[in-house]
């Protein structure tokens, strides 16, 4: 559970950064 919670948050943040970079 501990490994799953932070992993999902990290993925979301990485995706957001990549998506924002592509949008710009």
From Swiss-Prot:
GO molecular function, one term: heparin binding
Signal peptide: none
Disulphide bridges, residue numbers: none
Presence of keyword Ion transport: no
Entry keywords, A to Z: Disulfide bond, Growth factor, Heparin-binding
Record text on subunit structure and interactions: Heterodimer of a heavy and a light chain linked by disulfide bond(s).
Function text: HPTA is an acidic heparin-binding growth factor for hepatocytes.
Annotated protein name in UniProt: Heptapoietin A light chain
Organism listed in the record: Oryctolagus cuniculus
């Amino acid at each position: 559970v501990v490994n799953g919670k932070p992993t999902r948050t990290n993925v979301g943040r990485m995706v957001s950064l990549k998506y924002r970079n592509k949008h710009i």
